[in-house]
């Protein structure tokens, strides 16, 4: 596809305001202004549809994970100037929940509200890990996301926070502390760029692992690392899987 055609294709995507980057601010009980910034550092590019049925639901099934694995960065700042990075000092737990949505409108420009499709399988929830590279921040990694049906989609990532310190809870309109104790609060959402899910016949194959995937794997995160490029072949050995050339690299394994 040439650049002109590619721009035409992109014009059919459903527009979203929080693609790739998103931010929000809040005020705590003690009057501190906190700003949350999320960025999709590693975008999903392609996937092979894993189909449906009992075989796809099996934990041991080859679910054809989205490639490369999406990686989302979170940074938290305190103050009006947003220069005081407090990501590593916040006394709270964070997790990110991924959902799948259509990236293109259906007939007549309408957006499908059907809940049965598209279907995202795998592990849609990730806890935050603190890494020093590529920059000191909190990261959410999704190495096990698959899509059952071919099409053009985007991932939506919703951040939830479980504050452990009462002083970090939200300030109410009356300026009083929230009536509830420790609870989980939705903070913000960021969306990925559109990506393609191919049928088995059209799937072009997997690409070499990105430098970012290798970087987080070197820091102990469980990410499949592809040693070399291996495009799809017409025939595979009986029982063979497209993930045979992958290895799970962790800091413990290399120790």
UniProtKB/Swiss-Prot annotation:
Location(s), subcellular: Nucleus; Cytoplasm
Pfam families: Velvet
Acidic residues composition bias: residue spans: 245-255
PROSITE patterns, alphabetized: VELVET
Disruption phenotype: Impairs melanin biosynthesis. Abolishes the light-stimulated formation of aerial mycelia. Results in abnormal hyphal swelling, increases sensitivity to shaking force and significantly reduces hydrophobicity.
Domain Velvet: 31-226
Family according to the record: Belongs to the velvet family. VeA subfamily.
Annotated organism of origin: Zymoseptoria tritici (strain CBS 115943 / IPO323) (Speckled leaf blotch fungus)
A biological process term (GO) from this entry: sporulation resulting in formation of a cellular spore
Quaternary context: Component of the heterotrimeric velvet complex composed of LAE1, MVE1 and VEL2; MVE1 acting as a bridging protein between LAE1 and VEL2.
Region of interest: Disordered: 163-184, 229-255
Top-level division of the source organism's lineage: Eukaryota
Cited function: Component of the velvet transcription factor complex that controls sexual/asexual developmental ratio in response to light, promoting sexual development in the darkness while stimulating asexual sporulation under illumination. The velvet complex hat acts as a global regulator for secondary metabolite gene expression. Controls the expression of the melanin gene cluster. Mediates the light-stimulated formation of aerial mycelia.
The UniProt record lists the keyword Transport: no
Keywords: Cytoplasm, Nucleus, Sporulation, Transcription, Transcription regulation
Keyword RNA-binding: no
UniProt name for this protein: Developmental and secondary metabolism regulator MVE1
GO terms for cellular component: cytoplasm; nucleus
Primary location group: nucleus
Short sequence motif named Nuclear localization signal, residue ranges: 45-50
């Amino acid at each position: 596809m040439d650049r002109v055609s590619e721009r035409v294709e992109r014009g059919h995507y459903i527009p979203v305001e929080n693609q790739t980057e998103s931010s929000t601010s809040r005020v705590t009980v003690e009057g501190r202004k906190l700003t949350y910034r999320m960025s999709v550092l590693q975008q999903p590019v392609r996937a092979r549809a894993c189909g449906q049925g009992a075989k796809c639901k099996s934990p041991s099934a080859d679910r054809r994970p989205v490639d490369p694995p999406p990686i989302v960065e979170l940074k938290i700042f305190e103050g009006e100037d947003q220069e005081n990075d407090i990501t590593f000092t916040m006394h709270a737990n964070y997790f990110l929940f991924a959902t799948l949505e259509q990236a293109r409108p259906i007939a007549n420009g309408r957006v499908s509200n059907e809940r049965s499709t598209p279907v995202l399988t795998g592990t849609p929830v990730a806890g935050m890990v603190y890494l020093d590279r590529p920059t000191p921040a909190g990261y959410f990694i999704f190495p096990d996301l698959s899509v059952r049906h071919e099409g053009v989609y985007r991932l939506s990532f919703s951040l939830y926070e479980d504050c452990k310190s009462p002083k970090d809870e939200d300030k109410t309109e009356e300026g009083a502390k929230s009536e509830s104790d420790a609870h989980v609060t939705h903070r913000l959402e960021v969306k990925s760029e559109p990506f393609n899910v191919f049928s088995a016949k059209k799937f072009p194959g997997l690409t070499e692992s990105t430098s970012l995937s290798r970087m987080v794997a070197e820091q102990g995160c469980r990410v499949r690392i592809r040693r070399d490029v291996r495009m799809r072949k017409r025939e595979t050995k009986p029982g063979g899987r497209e993930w045979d050339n992958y290895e799970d690299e962790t800091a413990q394994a290399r120790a």
